[in-house]
Amino acid sequence: DDNDFTNSWLQNRIQTKLYGKHRIKHELKLKGIADDMIDEHLDAHSSDDNEYARAFKLAQGKVGSFEGSDAQRSQRRLSQFLMRRGYSSAIAYRVCKDIFDES
């Protein structure tokens, strides 16, 4: 049923792919799942803290590929990457700030 499918799809995308809420919601809508069911499952599985932690983990793996680029360009590319993966601009900005402040 749709409930079980939504739950398993969401867990796979969160744990394996490290996708953000926006990307997951978009993919589930394309599969024909109702908005209220998507929102219910997203609220149960993902908080802003979890979302930030996943984005940070994803960014740590990606940031090495930007070596040799200037910092501003690297930050822009990393934030665009995170937003394509479904993270909000606020989370992408915060992750980039934290990643590049570490350096």
Where are these regions (language model features)?
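An alpha-helical, amphipathic repeat domain used for nucleic-acid recognition
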Residues: 1-103
